[in-house]
Regions:
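N-terminal targeting segments with Sec-dependent signals, encompassing both cleavable signal peptides
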Residues: 1-145
């Protein structure tokens, strides 16, 4: 008998959620949202708000291997004064140059000035102007001790 072969091609478009709808979905079923949609929800809240941090925490939990999700969530930890949590997240992406400035700042705030200098220098050498500024400030602080 002859064998038949049937090939199918399925294409679909995923509808993007408007921000207000995404806010509701974030509470009920955040897995339906992309990382970008979560970011768009987060920026509707004040940076220092609980909701802003919560969105990035959810993103880091749902996208645990995404460097941007981890870096953003660590940044909210850093801004909130939770340097240990920031470092825990940043350690997972320590080879990503985008994380180096925040790692340096987190180590400085946690009191590990040697590691802070190491990461700020790496970031500055990689062309991060904020890291260069932070490194200068850290060197002044070390000199004044």
């Amino acid at each position: 008998p002859y064998l038949r072969r049937t090939e199918y091609m399925i294409a679909y478009n995923v509808r993007a959620f408007p921000v207000e709808e995404a806010k509701t979905i974030l509470k009920s079923n955040p897995r339906l949202l992309s990382l970008n949609e979560m970011y768009l929800v987060a920026v509707t809240y004040p940076r220092e708000s609980k909701e802003f941090k919560e969105v990035f925490d959810i993103a880091a939990r749902l996208y645990p291997d995404d460097p941007i999700a981890l870096i953003n969530s660590a940044a909210t930890d850093l801004e909130g004064g939770n340097f240990v949590a920031a470092l825990e997240r940043l350690e997972r992406v320590k080879n990503d140059p985008r994380a180096w400035n925040n790692m340096g700042v987190s180590y400085a705030k946690a009191g590990d000035l040697a590691k802070a200098t190491e990461f700020l220098k790496k970031a500055a050498d990689n062309g991060d102007p904020m890291a260069a500024t932070n490194l200068k400030e850290l060197k002044k602080e070390i000199k004044n001790q």
